């Protein structure tokens, strides 16, 4: 059976890169005594795949890993086993069974992701910058420079910026694990295209906006938290998008 596990990554774990996070989760499965399926051959490894690697320095309430298991667990049992053995900053939120097959893996389904950007004290946008941003995201065309292994490429990110809202209400600011949560107005919510098709990072949106205003990007100004990751079940026709959280594609195990 294949299980999709949803977990949060907070606190100091935001400084851990993707490969180290993979090793961390493998050790967690071993410590928890979960009966994981291993590949065959000379170098057996756990059969598991990660949906959408998180950038270093970001926190998340929506990390996903698909794991093949040799025996059945209830969702509650598996979540409890993992949380009892989890390191500080990692908290398992849910576990659900998903169909086998390459087409059902989380990494092949990712199409959209939500983020909250929380400004550090003293770096908040004033009302004039907020209004400028609201006008900027409404443009029909927004050119940004995307960097990849093949070099730099100018792309229009406007069609892939699904939503951009400056919060009028206080929201939680994700900080170090032993700090008390802060609440502050002015957080920025972004919903962006994600995955292997067209992946738009929230820091690319911010850097492009700042550069368009003739200023230098300042990554220290804000903290980024990934709120949710979605699959698109709507098909390829224009206007037919139907986004569903990856965990929503699974079945609760009794």
List the model feature ranges, each with a label.
Residues 6-8, 12, 16, 20, ...:
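Extended, well-folded interaction surfaces typified by the phenylalanyl-tRNA synthetase beta subunit core
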Residues 7, 67-73, 117-123, 190-196:
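Short beta-strand-to-loop capping motifs
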Residues 38-69:
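Short, charge-patterned binding micro-sites
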Residues 61-116:
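Ordered, amphipathic secondary-structure segments that act as subunit-interaction surfaces
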Residues 78-86, 126-138, 205-206:
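Short amphipathic alpha-helices in soluble, non-transmembrane regions
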Residues 117-153:
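A contiguous pocket-lining binding segment that forms or flanks enzyme active sites
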Residues 138-254:
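Core RNA-modification/binding signature centered on pseudouridine synthases
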């Amino acid at each position: 059976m294949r299980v999709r596990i949803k977990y949060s990554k907070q606190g100091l774990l935001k400084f851990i890169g993707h490969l180290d996070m993979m090793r961390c989760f493998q050790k967690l499965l071993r410590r928890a005594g979960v009966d994981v399926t291993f590949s065959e051959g000379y170098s057996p490894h756990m059969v598991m795949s990660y949906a959408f690697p998180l950038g270093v320095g970001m926190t998340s309430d929506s990390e996903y890993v698909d794991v093949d298991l040799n025996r059945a667990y209830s969702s509650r049992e598996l979540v409890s086993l993992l949380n009892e053995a989890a390191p500080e900053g990692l908290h398992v939120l849910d576990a659900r069974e998903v169909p086998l097959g390459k087409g059902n893996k989380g990494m092949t389904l990712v199409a959209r992701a939500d983020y909250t950007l929380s400004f550090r004290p003293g770096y908040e946008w004033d009302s004039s910058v907020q209004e400028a941003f609201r006008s900027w995201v409404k443009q029909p065309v927004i050119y940004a420079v995307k960097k990849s292994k093949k070099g730099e490429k100018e792309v229009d990110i406007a069609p892939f910026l699904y939503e951009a809202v400056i919060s009028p209400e206080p929201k939680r600011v994700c900080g170090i694990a032993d700090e008390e949560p802060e609440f502050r107005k002015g957080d920025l919510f972004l919903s962006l295209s994600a995955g292997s098709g067209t992946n738009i990072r929230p820091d690319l949106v911010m850097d492009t906006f700042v550069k368009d205003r003739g200023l230098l990007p300042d990554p220290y100004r804000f903290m980024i938290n990934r709120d949710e990751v979605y699959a698109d079940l709507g098909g390829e026709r224009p206007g037919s998008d139907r986004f569903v959280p990856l965990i929503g594609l699974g079945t609760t195990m009794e």
